[in-house]
Design a protein with these regions (language model features):
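Short alpha-helix capping/helix-loop boundary micro-motifs
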Residues: 22-23, 27-31
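Primarily a LysM-type cell-wall glycan-binding module
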Residues: 1-19, 40-55
């Protein structure tokens, strides 16, 4: 008998319907990956006719079976281990680049955590999301940020953010804003079929309440939010599911949508104000060139909106003093390139200073 794939179905859901395992379905249909398309016919090999049945709730052991699609290769190196993860894709098996645990960082709080730059590049995926950017230079700003943060499949799971993912390193921990949960919710909303294929069949899900809840199934219980992200950080097969999702169009677009909403548009909002000599001045009247907007957006991603305004105020006041600007109206003529230079000089953290200075060489216009 055969089964025709319907919308939102996955190998996991189909296998449960017929009492088979995912591996059995893949073997009899010569499938190289878990990816399906609507209308695809699958051979259902049964010893005798069976009426399809749908269990009331998924069995956690089935999640453990599907997770075996992510093959973790470990290379002990004494005080740490090197790893790669291999997983099937429509174009054949993909193997990650090399990464390690016990990551050498003063910010490390989880020895099992890793740092992985990724392979799903901004440039090669640009056509998938260019239409989302209201201004052309938003693309270049996001590209600049990606150079400092990572690819669409990048991972950081060693620091206090618990588990961070994507080209802007969206954080999982609630204390860090849980922006990754927003990305996953958007991914599921935009393309539930792809979300199920990337996550649900592996026991990873989003409960879309007023405040979305991130969930991961384990043999004992279903974990939520910080505990769930900790499980992903400590389980490289689950980490592999995130890496694989970073190659999917809908996940890439979800990342860009949230980046635009939470960082770009908030950073350049006309409601953002600067206090100068006791007077509130719209920041859009001060830093209004491409370069000025790029600086504001990059700082918002790296330090948050409040943190960005603090360092911007100090740099703007310094440049105003150098230039003899004494009024709020005069700030409109401030040298924005000089603001970037002063802000970088004020920075004691080498990485943050270098990141800011890179803006001067990205081709952004500072012409007023």
């Amino acid at each position: 008998m055969t089964h025709t794939v319907q919308a939102k179905e996955t190998l996991f859901s189909i296998s449960k319907k017929y009492g088979l395992t995912v591996e059995q379905l893949m073997k009899v249909n010569n499938l190289l990956s878990n990816n399906l398309f609507i209308g695809q016919n699958l051979v259902i090999s049964l010893p005798s006719p069976v009426t399809p049945n749908v269990p009331a709730k998924p069995v956690v052991s089935s999640y453990l079976d599907t997770r075996k699609a992510f093959v973790v290769n470990k290379q002990p190196k004494g005080t740490f281990n090197n790893y790669t993860i291999s997983f099937p894709s429509p174009n054949g098996t993909i193997t990650t680049g090399l990464f390690r645990d016990n990551y050498p960082s003063p910010n490390r709080v989880n020895a099992k955590g890793i740092s992985y730059t990724g392979k799903s590049l901004f440039d090669t995926n640009r056509t998938l999301f260019a239409d989302l950017c209201q201004q052309n230079y938003y693309l270049e700003v996001l590209h600049h940020i990606a150079k400092n943060e990572g690819c669409f499949d990048a991972i950081n799971s060693y620091d206090k953010a618990i588990f961070s993912f994507g080209f802007i390193q969206f954080t999982g921990a609630k204390a860090s804003g849980a922006m990754l949960t927003r990305v996953l919710q958007r991914f599921k909303l935009r393309d539930e079929y792809a979300f199920n294929d990337c996550f649900t069949q592996y026991g990873i899900n989003i409960q879309s309440d007023k405040v979305p809840i991130f969930k991961v199934a384990t043999p004992a219980i279903t974990l939520e939010d910080d505990a769930a992200y900790t499980e992903v950080a400590n389980n490289l097969q689950l980490t592999g599911a995130f890496i694989a999702s970073g190659f999917r169009r809908s996940m890439i677009r979800a990342q860009v949508e949230i980046a635009l909403e939470e960082y770009v548009l908030k950073a350049v909002s006309p409601t953002v104000m600067l206090n100068f000599k006791g007077q509130s001045v719209p920041l859009n009247n001060v830093l209004k060139t491409e370069g000025g907007f790029a600086l504001r957006i990059d700082l918002c991603v790296n330090r948050g909106l409040t943190g960005s305004l603090s360092v911007l105020k100090t740099a703007i006041e310094k440049v105003a003093q150098e230039s003899g600007i004494t009024t709020a109206v005069g700030l409109a003529k401030i040298n924005e390139r000089r603001v970037v230079e002063v802000l970088a000089m004020n920075e004691t953290d080498t990485l943050k200073r270098d990141r800011t200075l890179k803006l001067l060489n990205e081709g952004f216009s500072f012409w007023k």
